[in-house]
């Protein structure tokens, strides 16, 4: 916690200015993933957002190109309190809410199974 406080105090990112936040306290991973999210949205391709770091990148992408939120699918709600706060800002709901904090793409894998099952049910009921 103190490292984050010190980093923010030293670098003084302008809250609400996604590019400034990215430049001052973001990493290459955040920049790259934000670009993938924006690029997908510009092509109308959804992106699965999985976990706290990916959600931080999604928040940056949203700050740069708000339309991209329409193309974000959130795999799960992490037990990390910051995750819920970021999702509230993005106004997005997770596919799975099981208090997970496992990493390694576990949330995305589970969310894909849920989505596939929902599609199967829809297709069978629509016949």
Regions found by a protein language model. Name each.
Residues 1-127:
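N-terminal loops that bind phosphate or other acidic moieties
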